Amino acid sequence: MSSKNNPESETKAKNKWEKVMEAEEEQEEGGGDGSQEMEPHREGLEFPSREKLEGQLTRMEHKVDEYKTQYLRAQAEMDNLRKRIEREKADIIKFGSKQLITDLLPVADSLIHGLESPASEDPQVKSMRDGMSLTLDLLHNTLAKHGVQVINPNPGDPFDPALHEAMSVQAVPDAKPDTIIQVLQKGYQLNGRVLRAARVIVAG
């Protein structure tokens, strides 16, 4: 008997064909293209809004400004430190000998007081005075080489509290008020800085 006239064979062939078709449909539904597989992942992504991005940009700009300000402040502090070190170095050069010169002032005072004593015709005393005068000149010249200036006002000069120290105030009819009557002790300054003010008597 041929298969065409066999109902059982026809049924088996039909069932087999249906299974093949079902398998192909399942493959199409399950496989699809790559875009369908990626779709669930795309749906899970969250992109920031424009406002959020602008806010982040603003915060970053503020941070940049803050760091720039800190840098400029640090640079200014370094410049100030460098200038201060340069000033201190210059002061050391200009006033490093201050203590030594201050210690020499009593020597100059002693020579000046000795020369202020009454003159004598005694040859020995006269020779001593000449030696003291030469020594004082030599001392003043040496001090001048190191930036020392003598503060020696004249009677009648205006009193300057920055350079003079008033030891007393006296009423003198012919003198103008606040003028120097007498110099008791010379003063000294080093490169414009007063080491010791001149001690004077002032008219009141």
Curated annotation (Swiss-Prot):
List locations, semicolon-separated: Cytoplasm
Q: Where is this region: Disordered?
A: 1-52
Q: Which GO terms describe its biological process?
A: protein folding
Q: Which InterPro entries does the annotation name?
A: GrpE, GrpE_coiled_coil, GrpE_head
- Mind telling me which Pfam families this protein's record contains? GrpE (PF01025)
Checking Gene3D superfamilies in the record gives: 3.90.20.20, Head domain of nucleotide exchange factor GrpE (2.30.22.10)
Principal localization reads cytoplasm
Q: tRNA-binding as a keyword? A: no
PANTHER family, per the entry: GRPE PROTEIN, GRPE PROTEIN HOMOLOG, MITOCHONDRIAL
Q: How is the subunit organization of this protein annotated in UniProt?
A: Homodimer.
User: So what does this one do?
Assistant: Participates actively in the response to hyperosmotic and heat shock by preventing the aggregation of stress-denatured proteins, in association with DnaK and GrpE. It is the nucleotide exchange factor for DnaK and may function as a thermosensor. Unfolded proteins bind initially to DnaJ; upon interaction with the DnaJ-bound protein, DnaK hydrolyzes its bound ATP, resulting in the formation of a stable complex. GrpE releases ADP from DnaK; ATP binding to DnaK triggers the release of the substrate protein, thus completing the reaction cycle.
Provide the family line: Belongs to the GrpE family.
The protein in question is named Protein GrpE
**High-level lineage:** Bacteria, Pseudomonadati, Pseudomonadota, Gammaproteobacteria, Legionellales
Q: Which gene encodes it?
A: grpE
